[in-house]
Amino acid sequence: MSYGRPPPDVEGMTSLKVDNLTYRTSPDTLRRVFEKYGRVGDVYIPRDRYTKESRGFAFVRFHDKRDAEDAMDAMDGAVLDGRELRVQMARYGRPPDSHHSRRGPPPRRYGGGGYGRRSRSPRRRRRSRSRSRSRSRSRSRSRYSRSKSRSRTRSRSRSTSKSRSARRSKSKSSSVSRSRSRSRSRSRSRSPPPVSKRESKSRSRSKSPPKSPEEEGAVSS
C-alpha cells in the first residue's frame, strides 16, 4: 500500500479493527493474511504524526460482509509477529489522513470568531477567581463562627464554674453555722440549771445536824 496516493473509496465496505500490532507489521503483511478469507478492499495503519511509527492497530476493509465475519472469527486470537491479535467490527469510519488535515484549519466547535478555547479562557479564569474568593470568604466565615462559638462555650463554662463555687461556699457557710448552733445547744443541755436562793437556804437548813437536849435546855433557860 502506497502512502502517496489518496485513500480509496471505502463506502459499502465492512471494516475490521485489528488491535495489538507490532511496530514492524506492515499493511502488505496484513493484506496477505486477511486475503485468505475474501477480497480485501483496503488496509490502513494509523501512524504518529511526528515519529511516523505505527500506533499499534489497523483497519482492514472487505467488499463482502460475510468475508469480514469469517476473517474476524478466524483471526481473533491468532498470533502475528509474536503478538496475539484482537479483531472486531469497527464502529467508526476511516479517520482522516494527516495531509488532509494540513490543507485547512480544524473545524470550529464553538461559535464566534477566532478560536473558542482562547475566548473562553478569561471566563474560566474569572470563574475560578470568583470561586476561590467565595471559598476563602466561606472559610473565613466558618473560622469566625467557630471562634465565636468557642468564646461562648468558654464564657458559659466560666459562669457555670463561678456559680458552682458560689454554691459550694454557701453550702460550706451554712454547714459551719449549723455545726456551731448544734455545739451551742449541746453545751447548754449539759450545764446544770441555776439554783434559786430560797432552794439553797432550805437545803442548808436541812443539812444542819439536830441539836442535843442539853443545848435545847440552855436555850430555854
Swiss-Prot record:
Extensively phosphorylated on serine residues in the RS domain. Phosphorylated by SRPK2 and this causes its redistribution from the nuclear speckle to nucleoplasm and controls cell fate decision in response to cisplatin treatment. KAT5/TIP60 inhibits its phosphorylation by preventing SRPK2 nuclear translocation. Acetylation on Lys-52 by KAT5/TIP60 promotes its proteasomal degradation. This effect is counterbalanced by HDAC6, which positively controls SRSF2 protein level by deacetylating it and preventing its proteasomal degradation. Keywords: Acetylation, mRNA processing, mRNA splicing, Nucleus, Phosphoprotein, RNA-binding. PROSITE patterns: RRM. The modification N6-acetyllysine is found at K52. GO terms for cellular component: cytosol; nuclear speck; nucleoplasm; nucleus. Interacts with BRDT. In vitro, self-associates and binds SRSF1/SFRS1 (ASF/SF2), SNRNP70 and U2AF1 but not U2AF2. Binds SREK1/SFRS12. Interacts with CCNL1 and CCNL2. Interacts with SCAF11. Interacts with ZRSR2/U2AF1-RS2. Interacts with CCDC55 (via C-terminus). This is Serine/arginine-rich splicing factor 2. It comes from Homo sapiens. The gene is SRSF2.
